[in-house]
A protein has these predicted regions:
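Short helix-boundary/capping micro-motifs
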Residues: 28-45
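A late-sequence structural motif
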Residues: 123, 279-318
Length: 318
């Protein structure tokens, strides 16, 4: 951070009401990691330095913020209050730092991105290329996670941006109540493809309807993808005969190539590796496409590095 911050608390907590925002980061890290040692490691500090910060904070507040339970520690009610407000406070201060840095002509920063697996070999390389060309000072760190976990990572301030998806009629949509209080924006669509063995009768059509595959054996994906397949086939008037389940895209194509069954995969997943010999793909109707989303904390776009990354993601997903 190019600037140092102090958060002034106006409530009557002890004789010295001032504590720095880094202490909030320490409290949040303890909540996430479950120990002072692990929190110190995650923040790049020594364990004694973190312990001293906690002691100074407790002296200023006049209440304990952690308590020991066996060999671990947990937050007290006061500590949980601080941890709950920490993400909003740090996001606002990061935004202020970014705006001030912009005034000084700086265009650098680190953005923590989390995205689903099929985005890793498709979207992420294009994003990095875009940023290297237009904003070489922006650094991206990246972790894979499916949408529910990715949304939670933003909520817990472990990520700045989550790249997620949802399906039409998705009853487990992570952008519903679980994203309450977060900013969710739709940025594109990812067509769903029928994955068929070479020579399949439906392969001669420009688009395939799910109802055309009602009599086939099916290969399903992860539990959430399986749920979507059941809904998709249910809307087409049949229950799929699922003989195999795997979330390994290569395995799906291998099974299809051997005539074991048919499957559906998002276009992004299919484009993440060469289509296997003996396999053909045909698009399903556009109405079955999954929607791609960017999820952030409210106000995160005021942080210049985050805004630049959001704009770049929007471009590469267009």
């Amino acid at each position: 951070m190019p600037l140092a911050y102090a958060l002034i608390m106006t409530d009557n907590f002890g004789d010295d009401p001032e504590f720095d925002v880094q202490t909030l980061r320490v409290i949040k890290a303890i909540a996430d990691e479950g120990s002072i040692t692990a929190a110190a490691t995650s923040l790049g500090y020594s364990q004694p330095a973190v312990s001293q910060q906690i002691k100074r904070l407790e002296k200023r507040l006049g209440v304990a913020v952690i308590e020991r339970v066996g060999r671990s520690v947990r937050l007290t009610e006061a500590g949980r209050v601080l941890a709950r407000h920490a993400p909003a406070v740090t996001t606002a201060l990061d935004a202020a730092a970014g705006e001030l840095a912009e005034l000084r002509g700086l265009r650098a920063g680190r953005v923590r991105l989390v995205g689903f697996p099929s985005a890793s070999p498709t979207v992420v390389p294009r994003l990095l290329t875009d940023l290297a060309e237009h904003h070489p000072g922006i650094t991206i760190t990246y972790v894979e996670a499916e949408p529910p976990e990715a949304v939670e990572a933003v909520r817990e301030d472990r990520a700045d941006i989550a790249l997620t998806f949802s399906y039409p009629g998705d009853r487990d949509d992570p952008h519903g109540s679980s994203a309450s209080g977060l900013a969710v924006r739709a940025v594109g669509a990812d067509d769903l493809l029928a994955v068929l063995p070479e020579g399949h009768p439906a392969g001669g059509r420009e688009r395939v309807r799910v109802a055309d595959l009602a009599d086939e054996n099916w290969i399903a994906g992860c539990p959430r993808c399986r749920g979507h397949l059941l809904e998709l086939c249910g809307r087409a008037g049949f229950e799929p005969k699922i003989g195999f389940e795997t979330d390994n895209f290569v395995a799906v194509e291998g099974l299809v190539a051997q005539g074991i069954g048919v499957a559906t995969l998002p276009r992004m997943a299919v484009e993440s590796f060469p289509v296997m010999p003996g396999v053909i793909t045909r698009p399903l109707p556009h109405a079955e496409a999954r929607t791609l989303h960017l999820v952030t904390a409210h106000g995160a776009e005021r942080v210049p590095a985050v805004r630049i990354a959001l704009d770049a993601l929007t471009r590469v997903l267009a």
